[in-house]
Amino acid sequence: MSSFHKNSSYMEDPDYPGYSGSQNHTQNYLRTQDDLEFPGCLDNPGFHHPRRNPYSSDSRTNPDYHHSLAEPDYPGSPSDADYQNTRCHPRSAHPRTRPDYEPDYEPDYNDFQSESYHPDLSMEPDYPGSHGHPGFAGVRSSVNSTGPRTNLGYLDLEEPDYPGAQGNSYHSGPRSHSNLPGSRRNAGYAGSRINSYPDSLGEPDYPGAENQPNSPDFYGKPDYPGAEEGDVYSPSKTLGVIGRSRGSFGILGREDGDYPEGIEMASLGMAGDPRNGYVNPAYMRGSSPVCPDRNLLLCARDWNTSPQGQKLIASLVPMTSRDRIKTIRNQPRTMQEKRELRKIVDKEKNKQSHGTFEANCCAQCLSSLSLAYRRTKSSLSELLNYISLWQKRFKVIGGKFGTSVLSYFSFLRWLLKFNIFSFVMNFSFIIIPQFTVGEKNTLQFTGLEFFTGAGYFRETVMYYGFYTNSTIRHRMGGASYNMQLAYIFTIGACLVICFFSLLFSMAKYFRNNFINPHIYSRGIAKLIFCWDFTVTHEKAVKLKQKNLSTEIRENLSEIRQENDRLTLNQKLTRFSVHVAAWLVSTGITAACCVAVYYLAEYNSEFLKTHKNPGAVLLLPFVVSCINLAVPRFYSMFRLVERYEIPRQEVYVLLIRNIFLKISIVGILCYYWLNIVALSGEECWETLIGQDIYRLLLMDFVFSLADSLLGEFLRRLIGMKFITSLSLQEFDIARNVLELIYAQTLAWLGIFFCPLLPFIQMITLFIMFYVKNVSLMMNFQPPSKAWRASQMITFFIFLLFFPSFTGVLCTLAITIWRLKPSADCGPFRGLPSFIQSIYSWIDTLSHRPGYLWVVWIYQNLIGSVHFFFILTLIVLIITYLYWQITEGRKVMIRLLHEQIINEGKDKMFLIEKLTKLQDIERRANPSTLVLERREVEQQSPLHLEELDAAPDLRLRRSMQEENAIA
């Protein structure tokens, strides 16, 4: 086997034709042992040549040796029946086993050294007993043999057979001199470790190779007698290497050949280790022991001492902290190497700045503060992610059902945060002060109050009518607390903060999901080629795999939907169906609103004449039934409309359902503000609060029953009775509209029932776990995978308009136009709720220190012109932002098309280059041999596959030449 030097040229290769063949091959041979990519390298696990020599007289596999492991049974071996008690070449006149044997260092065939190479000769010697002899059973070069290497039909290019190669015995170099004095390949040599068989084990045969001190065999252990007594080489190491060396060809050679040259070779790491006594010269002399043929910047060791590493460190020192961190972060290194690089750069920077410490004191302080700020920010971010609600649950849901179903639970958690904030505000500034002056409740609690909200709860902090209108002052001359201002400012602050939070959230999600360049590339590179290697837990790995699979299906579905095109008739048909569905849904919504209004009036008249506590539940029960049944009827329209894109179907259902629910809430608000508030009822604010509480509670009960009973029964029917139904899919539109409807009621009732955010918080917390369990048990993943990156943005938009804006309009009418109750609430006795603000401003106008507050109110808050100018500015900024967004979209689209065109240009050039190379190969087929050698040298791991499979390219070229001939 040739020993190719990766860092040398072909003229320095011992197997190259015309190589002079130095008698001393020790250095060149050993130099290849630490070349991991050399096909014949001892350290190459894919090398399949033998390590154990069954022919050596001193080998441990020799049957005469008392520790023999195997006995060869080939012709001419001691185990063969026809063996004539000789070990040397059958034509040798002096066999070593004869008593009168004398070492003969002359060649045992005639005129060996005098024979020169002739072009007409075959590629291998043909003397008697040689592989090249025509009469030899295992001949390779005989034209009559089925497998000669010089035959055109034989495509095995395992070893070169040109003059000067190891397989050619006419080569004048020492490797082919099997009978050269002192050669290991000479059968007459007493210390030989290999057989006279040419190229039997791929070992060096140069003179004196056996004199290397403690020279190991190919198992990492010497094969001379008594080797097992050494302290350096233990049997455990030998057995370990033996296990690695047993490849697909066995120990003795190829399965289809008569020569032992196909045995797999393992690493010589133990042999080359200086600790074993044997010091490989190449081990100590390599140009780069760590990374001999790679970039030093990517090396795992001593990278900082290389010129490239020093240059990198020198370039990082003058950088700012931000740029230095960004540069180190982008380095293709492990985290440990990046930390070491940062420490080295910090040390170098400290050395350079040691003399100018006083001058750079401020800069160092700023750098330290910046570093502390970044670390604190990172720690807080990690803490928030760690304590984030249901983080693991979200990963499971997203991995199994995709981002579309996950968007519902993300929206639910987002609403829960809103209600937690509102409850904290109300509890801190309204409820706690009222506890200090509240009177004891004398009503009896019966339990029915949980459903009706009346009775015992009427005289608690739950409703508006219980709060005092006085100024709280615990001692004379102390600080006072105006309950009227606290009530209206706290409710107003909650609504204002919710307003800006909704705007900020819509802007953030809009920027991430609508202006993201991934809408053109879809993040394919990140999706396919990125893997979080910090994920090591088996369950987490499987979950990550599910996530990747779901995201890939979502991206593929979008690509397929973009390529679908409809004909004109199909478009007209679908348009007609959509118009009809919209007309039917609008008519149903109008009918439901009319029914709810007349039911509310009838129920109010009925309650005046009947004192039945359960009668108050009739209106919320009917409204909840409508909200449960009508959206399911809307969902059946999908069978007729047949939307190809699932996102469009969800959008249409959302709009229809929100139109239904908001219309019902609007009719109820009209009834409350125009019928109940003007009816002269005692404490009408508390009555409205009770109605909203009952609506919210009844909606929660219906949702709970639908999840625990309805969805469970639907699963049983689909699995047991009507199997064609199978499992149902999660209805995102209907479930999201339930959340929006409940949150609308919570915002609407926050003025009349300050504890309503707390009730909504409890219901959302329970609904998450109920929906999660029902989802895992009763639903299947969506049949059409689709991404829902823009769904949360649409949900928040629907929550903002018309839900939140409708609530603001209703509360504005209540505060500015309606008269408060005369006997209850903090605003009792006032002509309007806003009158408390006017009285406060009048009081501040008589105090010189607060005149700036009066000016702000009169010229900004209370001025119509200010709000007109502010609205105009907001619209202008929105328009400019929209134009910038559209411009960026166009630029992103152009850049994306440019990248695609550049890729097409490269593919065109590659195809042209490939065609030119094919034409050149057909014109000069001999270049295929050198190309094969380059492939073997560059890809040693595939050497076994290349040897086992024929060279299809060579066969194709030869067939074309034969056809032309």
UniProtKB/Swiss-Prot annotation:
Belongs to the TMC family. Residues 1-10, 20-31, 166-181 have a biased composition (Polar residues). This is Transmembrane channel-like protein 5. Pfam families: TMC (PF07810). One of its GO terms (cellular component) is plasma membrane. Residues 1-417, 468-484, 600-613, 679-691, 769-794, 881-965 are extracellular. It is a multi-pass membrane protein. Residues 439-444, 506-578, 635-657, 713-747, 816-859 are cytoplasmic. Probable component of an ion channel. Molecular function hasn't been characterized yet. The chain crosses the membrane at residues 418-438, 445-467, 485-505, 579-599, 614-634, 658-678, 692-712, 748-768, 795-815, 860-880. Keywords: Membrane, Phosphoprotein, Transmembrane, Transmembrane helix. It comes from Rattus norvegicus (Rat). One of its GO terms (molecular function) is mechanosensitive monoatomic ion channel activity. Residues 61-70 have a biased composition (Basic and acidic residues). Residues 1-235 are annotated as: Disordered. Signal peptide: none annotated. It is found in: Membrane. The modification Phosphoserine is found at S248. InterPro entries: TMC, TMC_dom.
